[in-house]
């Protein structure tokens, strides 16, 4: 590590119950959110002259799950370069050696709001279809690199007032498993696909279910499947969409199948009743056409059996969405993930700590005078 990193580059400020020790270029820190992974502040970058988001990863080495997630997020943010995925602008640590290393700060673009705040606004079809199009483009880009999200929700999708949208994180690592019978834990399960809830195998269109739930919420202004735990989540889905076929039941593990088959049978509610005309914008004949297209898209995304659910590509070509189709956005070249073992890696905490430290040092090496190169996704040799 070069001697250029000295205390004079940093200052400390108290944010809620956490101390942020950040580079002096980042001023006017204001807390804007917190999650399982850490606290996020808005700040002004005096070098670039722009507002940014500074995220402090909370105790990234407290256990292997946190450490793996921190490493994965850092690697993916460095590799992914797409207009519908949040951009990483800087990475730093105030500590001067691996032995002292404790904190990781990620600096990203600052957006105006997350989708939770948009849900209570009345959106016209144009804005709604454009938001969904951008979501699908971002998801497709992640899929092209072998990243299946599995945990899309309004709180990790951010927007600007000009209706541009970006996905904030990379979801569950491939090795993260969800067991249907496990005790309830603190996680937003309302948007998770049946195959994730039921501990089945999954493929790319697992993320389409989440988009369907988010779209349904944008239309209705409230969560559409609001379960109190995993089991109740399943109940809420089948009460509205109906009990799935025997063919679907065969794909379940015996213990899960036994539970699912013993639930009361539900015929399901028609989509015209779940999403009636009056909850959509309807000022013109064109709106009426768009309403019927929007409902059709919902009916193809909110399908319990993933083998019968629409794919990301099919959703991008759906009449409700395809008006926005631009190959440069929908067919962008896949990101090159330089760590081929990213999803499968398992390490002791000290090894994770060293891997993350190397990533932070690599970023600092590639940054000149605190300003990152135009392409943070430039390839590294490992």
UniProtKB/Swiss-Prot annotation:
Record has NAD as a keyword: no
SMART domains: S_TKc (SM00220)
UniProt-annotated catalytic positions: 151
GO terms assigned for molecular function: ATP binding; JUN kinase activity; protein serine kinase activity
PROSITE patterns cross-referenced by the UniProt entry: MAPK, PROTEIN_KINASE_DOM, PROTEIN_KINASE_ST
One record GO biological process: rhythmic process
Leading EC class: transferase
Comment, domains: The TXY motif contains the threonine and tyrosine residues whose phosphorylation activates the MAP kinases.
The protein's name in its UniProt record: Mitogen-activated protein kinase 9
């Amino acid at each position: 590590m070069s001697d250029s990193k000295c205390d004079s580059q940093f200052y400390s400020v108290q944010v809620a119950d956490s101390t942020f020790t950040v580079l002096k270029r980042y001023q006017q820190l204001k807390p804007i959110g917190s999650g399982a992974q850490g606290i996020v502040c808005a700040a002004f970058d005096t070098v670039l002259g722009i507002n940014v988001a500074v995220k402090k990863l909370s105790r990234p080495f407290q256990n292997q799950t946190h450490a793996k997630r921190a490493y994965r997020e850092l690697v993916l943010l460095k590799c992914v370069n797409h207009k519908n995925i949040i951009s990483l602008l800087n990475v730093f640590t105030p500590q001067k050696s691996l032995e002292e290393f404790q904190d990781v700060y990620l600096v990203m673009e600052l957006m105006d709001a997350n989708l939770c705040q948009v849900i209570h606004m009345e959106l016209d079809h144009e804005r709604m279809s454009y938001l969904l199009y951008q979501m699908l483009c971002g998801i497709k880009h992640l899929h092209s690199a072998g990243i299946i999200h599995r945990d899309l929700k309004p709180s990790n999708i951010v927007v600007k007032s000009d209706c541009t949208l970006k996905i904030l994180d990379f979801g569950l690592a491939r090795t993260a498993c969800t067991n249907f019978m496990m005790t309830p834990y603190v996680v937003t399960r309302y948007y998770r696909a049946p195959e994730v809830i039921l501990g089945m195998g999954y493929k790319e269109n697992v993320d389409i279910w989440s988009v369907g739930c988010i779209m349904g919420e944008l239309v209705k202004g409230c969560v559409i499947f609001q379960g109190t735990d995993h089991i109740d989540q399943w109940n809420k889905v089948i009460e509205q969409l109906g009990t799935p076929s025997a063919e679907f039941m065969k794909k379940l593990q015996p213990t899960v199948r036994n539970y699912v088959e013993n639930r009361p049978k539900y015929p399901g509610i028609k989509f015209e009743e779940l999403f009636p005309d009056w909850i959509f914008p309807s000022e013109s004949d064109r709106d009426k056409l768009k309403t019927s297209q929007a409902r059709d898209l919902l009916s193809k995304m909110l399908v319990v059996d993933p083998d019968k659910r629409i794919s990301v590509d099919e959703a991008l070509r759906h009449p409700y969405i395809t008006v926005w189709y631009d190959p440069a956005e929908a067919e962008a070249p896949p990101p090159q993930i330089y760590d081929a073992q990213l999803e499968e890696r398992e390490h002791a905490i000290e090894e994770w700590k060293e891997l993350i430290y190397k990533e932070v040092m690599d970023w600092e090496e590639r940054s000149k005078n605190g300003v990152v190169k135009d392409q943070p996704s430039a390839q590294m040799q490992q």
